[in-house]
Design a protein with these regions (language model features):
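Intrinsically disordered, low-complexity regions enriched in acidic/Ser/Thr/Pro/Gln residues
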Residues: 6-87, 91-100, 219-230, 236, ...
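Conserved active-site and cofactor/substrate-binding residues in soluble primary-metabolism enzymes
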Residues: 28-32, 66, 120, 124, ...
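Buried hydrophobic positions in well-ordered alpha/beta secondary-structure cores of metabolic enzymes
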Residues: 37, 129, 187-189
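General beta-strand structural signal in soluble alpha/beta enzymes
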Residues: 47-49, 107-109, 137-141, 155-157, ...
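Short coil/turn connectors at secondary-structure junctions
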Residues: 65-66, 101-104, 133-135, 150-153, ...
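Extracellular/luminal Protease-associated
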Residues: 95-139
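Ligand/cofactor pocket segment of small-molecule handling proteins
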Residues: 126-147, 152-161, 165
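Acidic, glycine-rich flexible loop/linker segments
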Residues: 158-234
């Protein structure tokens, strides 16, 4: 029952957004995606993204973009559930994570008073999730096994720690909030070493054109700023030219 419940919920989204649409967005870093969203949805300028520094498992990795899979965890004290219940929940979680649509990004909220006492993420979990097609993860909790974790798995978290303590799943397929980013199942998430942002489905196919426009505007400013004869007067002239770029 529990496995079927979560798999069903994980497959509920009916969207015309394809994996190719999301792959295109990985050409740009998360700050660039945020810039584009500010133009497309100006009223959402102040929220929808992480607002605290996160540690990156591998800052050199390119951005990832996928459909959210969510869960909450605790680690400071043992789970009140039986071993059988915990095993069933973990199995249900993996079924949920592997469900379509894909690709996926896992967002895990550590709900302990002091998040990160025990790490959910390490060598085993990064390899399991990568094997299930997950591109990466965002958490306010901790991660460990830095040298041994799955290469290419784009994980950003609240801290690095040595122990998994009593870490256990509390809930899955639920709304979570990680450092200001609130997400639920199948929300579209873009993430890299800078943090993560939620992309409304209606904005996905608009972003490439808006990024192109912003880039052309910024290029004029950058060329002027890097010139040997750069002055405030030249900056003012350049700023005026930007208005004519559409």
């Amino acid at each position: 029952m529990i496995i079927g419940q979560f798999v069903k919920k994980g497959k509920m989204m009916d969207t015309n957004i394809t994996s190719d649409d999301l792959a295109i967005l990985t050409k740009w870093d998360t700050p660039t995606i945020c810039n584009a969203l500010e133009e497309i949805i100006p009223e959402r300028r102040g929220y929808g993204f992480t607002t605290t520094h996160l540690f990156s498992l591998d800052p050199a990795l390119p951005p990832v973009c996928g459909f959210a899979r969510t869960a909450t965890i605790q680690a400071a004290a043992p789970s009140p559930e039986t071993t059988e219940q915990m095993v069933a929940k973990r199995a249900a979680y993996y079924e949920y994570v592997a469900a379509t649509p894909a690709p996926t990004i896992v967002i895990i909220q550590d709900i302990d008073p002091q998040p990160g006492v025990g790490a959910f993420w390490g060598e085993v979990q990064t390899n399991i999730h990568k094997g299930l097609g997950v591109l990466g993860a965002v958490t306010n909790g901790s991660f460990r096994d830095v040298p041994d974790s799955a290469r290419g798995f784009n994980l950003i978290g609240g801290k690095v720690g040595p122990s998994h303590a009593f870490v256990h799943l509390v809930d899955i397929d639920c709304q979570v909030t990680v450092f200001g980013l609130t997400a639920k199942t199948n929300d579209i998430i873009h993430a890299d070493q800078h943090g993560a942002v939620l992309i409304p489905p209606a904005a996905v196919k608009q972003i490439p054109a808006v990024v192109d426009l912003i880039s052309r505007r910024e290029e004029i400013i950058l060329e002027a700023a890097k010139s040997a004869d750069f002055t405030v007067a030249k900056l003012k002239t350049t700023m005026g030219q930007i208005k004519d770029i559409h």
